[in-house]
């Protein structure tokens, strides 16, 4: 957290008289400031009284200690952290500016590409940089860059054959990857090498659906029916229409088996996740519960509620199901909260027709309300009109605990990656784009055709000398962000709906 400091100037004042000139070298005392008049102090007080003392799931465990905090001594970020329960690894907050950027789907100061190294870089002796995913509106797309492309050079730096060999190379790369203009050299997935110059865009529009495909026998040998593939990065309220369009495509194609790829999905808006589960649920389940949320003793049972398949704001059930009879989820350590909740909500209904391929999920069984500051009625007039110019802070304290219709929660512990264990564990294949050649997708299709998963691909070392360097800047967010994972409900929306 960044702390603010006040710099005081010490002034020497020359006193002039008609008899002689003297100089007073004693500094004037710095003007006193009232810490209780600072914006952070006001926000801290509101956070404690209106949010943490009311909505926080562990309020009974922390209220007494929080009442003793001298909030005039804390920045807003430090105050938020100080108010959390000792075992809470999920609550977090962000600035209004950050919230606006995320919800608008605009990424600033980015090439619109996620770079990584292989999970098995040590075993493979391959410390090169690959594209994990690329947003459709990234300027690199027009040069043929896709997931699986290998970055072999940037301004003034040529990557060694087997990737980083020294910390100096890693430092240079991290320092200069955002240079603009930038000259890139990539080896594309088809083996072609391309070199081009691009200017860093002011922002990149995101599309949280990475892929929506229908596979048939022409795409994968042995398929006797169409199989849908849906890859979603995050649940965002502003992109629900995109989910609708994708599933209209699957329904038209007669899809009965679906591969749902949530490997990088850390959760998000509860309305968006409810929309997805309503499409995925087998026919005839409209109106059936998929999650029950319980609150602290101050709010329970009045705010405890159950969400139902196909029930939305108009309180009328909608049969949105496309008639699936088998679903394969691709998930990973990055799959958290709302994405885990979709899987958990379907478990009682699909039983052995629900499969999990990839790696153990994050393990986040709870959710948050979206709590804005300022939160007076005047501010909400702006928010409800889609104007967030007055928004300063957004808080996401844990407010409720989730279980499915059979009372089962998402597995969790005090360490990350403590969630659902896959039926078939497979590493992330970043050497191939999302599709039938990607190992996890191929594994699901193989199971559909043969009834069993294929053996793991053999990792062949390309380098007999283990002298490569891992770039810590590529560490996944679930490892670096102690409060990773979201299942979000808008507080004002909740008041009107439940």
Can you say where each PLM-predicted feature lies in the sequence?
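Positively charged n-region of N-terminal signal peptides that target proteins for export
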Residues: 1-4, 19
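Sec-dependent signal peptide hydrophobic core
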Residues: 5-11
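Short conserved active-site loop signatures built around small residues
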Residues: 260
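Flexible, low-complexity junctional segments that flank or bridge functional domains
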Residues: 19-257, 266, 272, 282, ...
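Generic detector of ordered secondary-structure context
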Residues: 10, 39-40, 105, 338, ...
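C-terminal motif of bacterial Sec signal peptides marking the signal peptidase cleavage site
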Residues: 14-17
């Amino acid at each position: 957290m960044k702390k603010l400091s006040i710099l005081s100037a010490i002034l020497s004042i020359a006193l002039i008289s008609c008899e002689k000139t003297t100089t007073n070298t004693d500094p004037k005392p710095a003007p006193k400031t009232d810490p209780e008049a600072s914006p952070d102090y006001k926000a801290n007080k509101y956070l404690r009284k209106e949010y943490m003392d009311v909505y926080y799931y562990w309020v009974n465990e922390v209220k007494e200690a929080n009442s003793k905090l001298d909030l005039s001594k804390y920045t807003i970020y430090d105050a938020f952290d100080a108010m959390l329960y000792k075992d809470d690894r999920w609550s977090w907050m962000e600035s209004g500016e950050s919230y606006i950027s995320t919800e608008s789907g605009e990424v600033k100061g980015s090439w619109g590409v996620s770079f990584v190294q292989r999970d098995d870089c040590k075993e493979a002796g391959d410390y090169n940089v690959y594209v994990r995913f690329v947003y459709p509106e990234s300027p690199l797309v027009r040069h043929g860059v896709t997931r699986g492309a290998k970055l072999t050079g940037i301004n003034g730096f040529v990557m060694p054959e087997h990737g980083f060999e020294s910390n100096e190379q890693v430092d240079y790369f991290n320092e200069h990857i955002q240079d603009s203009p930038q000259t890139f050299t990539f080896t594309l997935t088809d083996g072609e090498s391309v070199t081009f110059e691009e200017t860093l865009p002011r922002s990149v529009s995101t599309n949280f659906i990475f892929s929506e495909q229908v596979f048939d026998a022409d795409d994968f040998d042995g398929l006797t029916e169409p199989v849908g593939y849906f890859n979603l990065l995050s649940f965002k309220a502003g992109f629900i229409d995109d989910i609708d369009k994708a599933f209209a495509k699957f329904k038209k194609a007669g899809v009965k088996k679906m591969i749902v790829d949530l490997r990088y999905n850390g959760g998000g808006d509860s309305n968006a996740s409810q929309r997805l589960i309503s499409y995925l649920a087998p026919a005839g389940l409209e109106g059936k519960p998929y999650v029950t949320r319980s609150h602290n003793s101050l709010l329970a049972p009045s705010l405890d509620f159950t969400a139902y398949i196909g029930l939305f704001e108009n309180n009328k059930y909608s049969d949105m199901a496309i008639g699936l009879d088998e679903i394969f989820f691709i998930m990973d350590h990055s799959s958290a909260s709302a994405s885990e909740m979709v899987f958990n909500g379907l478990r009682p209904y699909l039983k052995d027709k629900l499969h999990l391929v990839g790696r153990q999920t994050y393990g986040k069984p709870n959710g948050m309300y979206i709590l804005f500051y300022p939160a007076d009625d005047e501010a909400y007039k702006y928010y409800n009109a889609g104007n967030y110019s007055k928004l300063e802070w957004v808080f996401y304290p844990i407010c409720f605990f989730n279980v499915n219709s059979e009372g089962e929660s998402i597995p969790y512990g005090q360490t990350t990656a403590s969630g659902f264990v896959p039926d078939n564990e497979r590493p992330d294949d970043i050497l191939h784009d999302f599709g039938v050649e990607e190992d996890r997708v191929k594994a699901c299709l193989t199971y559909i055709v043969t009834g069993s998963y294929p053996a793991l691909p053999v990792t062949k070392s390309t380098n007999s000398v283990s002298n490569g360097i891992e770039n810590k800047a590529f560490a996944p967010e679930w490892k670096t962000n102690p409060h990773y994972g979201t299942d979000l409900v808008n507080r004002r929306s909740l008041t009107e709906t439940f």
